[in-house]
Amino acid sequence: IAQCLVGSEMCIRDRNTEYYDLGLEHRNETDDQVTIDAAEATKKYGVAVKCATITPNAARMEEYDLKKMYKSPNGTIRAILDGTVFRAPIVVKGIEPCVKNWVKPITLARHAYGDIYKNTEFYIDKPGDAYLVFEGEDGEERKELIQHFDGAGVLRGMHNLDDSVKSFARSCFNYALDTKQDVWFGSKDTISKTYDGRFKEIFQQLSLIHI
C-alpha cells in the first residue's frame, strides 16, 4: 500500500515520517499527552494520517485499568487544529447512488471546535439551583439561572468562539468555491437564538464577502 501511495518503491517509513501511538494503553501511560503531541505535529507539518482510536467509557476504564476517562482523541486533535470536518462522498462510475437522480455529490461540513467535544458536565445527586456564570476580566459578572433541580439530574456546559466560527465559515466557503458546490447552512436558531444564532450571523456576514 505504501508503495502504491508514494508511486515508487520507496517506503513511506523512509520519508522522515513521525509516528505517534494513540492506542488507549499508550494514551493512559502518557496521561494523553501523546494525543496533544500528535496534534501539534500535524499543525507543524500540515498533514497527517490517523487510524481509528477508542474513546473510553465506563467499561473500557475497567478493561484497560485507566487512570481516568480520557476524552475523544478526535475531539482533542480537532480542538488544537481548529479545523473543519468535511465528509465528501467518493463518486465512482458504475456505482449508483441510493437516490438515483442525485448526480452531484453532497458534502457535509461540521465545525470541529468546542460544543460537545469540549463540554463540561457532571451528575447532580441532590436538589438545588444550576447557574450559568461569566466573570469578565474587568470584574463584570453575568449570572443566569439554568434550572432548579428538585432531585437528581445531569448538567452540561458548552461554548464556542467567534474566531473559530469565522474560520469554520471561511473553510466552508473556500471549499465550496474550490469544488464548485453551493453552501446550505443549517442551524436551530429558532430555538437556540443566541448560540446557534451567532453561527448564523457570522455565516451571513462572511457570505457577503464571498459573493
What are the residue ranges of the model-derived segments?
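Short, ordered loop/turn segments at secondary-structure junctions
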Residues: 22, 53, 188-190
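Single conserved hydrophobic/aromatic residue that forms the stacking wall/gate
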Residues: 1-7, 209-210
